[in-house]
Amino acid sequence: MVEETDGYTLVELMVSLIVISILVLGSFNLFSSLLHSAIVSQRQSVASTLATNQMEYVKSLPYDQLAVSGGAIVATSYLPPTLTKKVQGVNYTVTTSITYADDAFDGCGSYPSQALKQQYCRNYPPPSGSPSTDTNAADYKVVHVTVKDKSGTELASLDTHVAALVAETASNSGALFIKVIDDSGQPVAGATINVTNTFTAPNVNVSDTTDANGIVILYNLPPSTTNYRYTITASNSGYSSLTTIVPNGSLQPTYSSQNLNAQSSSYVTLTIKPMGANSLIVESTDTNGSPLANAKIYIKGGYKKYTASSDTSYYYDNFSPSDIRPTTDGSGLAGITNLVPGSYFFCGDQGTTNCKVGNTTYYLAAAVPYGGTNPLQPI
């Protein structure tokens, strides 16, 4: 006679283990999620306190001192744009930006177009009875404070407006309107704009970032009415950079530096182009097809400096003002990087100068698309 005993079969045991594992894993995930939420909540609380403290500090300063280094406002002294605060072993980055704003309550400033006025003069339209043009468009300052953790995650953000304690008077300053587009005419958002003028007091060296419309507006700049002293540079990751230049006699720049009169504005549009690192391969041969080694190749092109069709000056020129011509290797090959997309010319305007092997000048017989098998292909 066989005696039966209570217990679990192997199948029942396996099912039980699976169920228990699921419950344990779910509990662990829940615990981890709750722990993560608690940590995030604590850090957001710390970040909020840091942002509030920074904002209160900025608001306690005299109005004329509300400007950050590398920012959009000209001043004689500057606040640091970023600070690192360590709380309970965690590093937080506190970033402050300060810009001017034009508000329609006392009229709008001088804008290049009605569309820009409606878009960038806050609270447009102006109330009845306000002046047709606000001669001091820098009505107040907008302070923006953000706090991020080391991963770059934004944990807190605050904004406020700060106005001067004295009555607004007509200014002895001007404004620059800068638009950045790509080569298809589309606005480039996030481009860095730097504006300098070493002939004003104080010197101007301010920067800002284009908005979604590719626009930067810089208010309250000191006037500079002659010799085109305001130099403007536009740059962006993955794009070419472009800097304005001054007229040369009767030659007018394609992208001109600016004069700026008091109580007026200047407007400039800059075109930057998407580009890659590897730009051009030159394969140099003689008329028999034999490679020319040690040949220095003169190349110019890209952005045209001046508008006159008779002038052939370009931003990229590897012989002037300094000689940086590439030299071909034993296979007659040379590579050039970081060229702006556009037209390029070889061996001078007529193909007769500055392509040399030693003291021997070689004339350009033909420039044809690269047909070799070198892995560094042109783009």
What are the roles of these predicted feature ranges?
Residues Y8-T52:
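Aliphatic-rich helix starts adjacent to a transmembrane/signal segment
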Residues S184-N203, T287-F319:
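Short, ordered, surface-exposed loop/turn motifs in non-cytosolic proteins
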Residues T225-T233, P341-G348:
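A short tyrosine-centered beta-strand micro-motif
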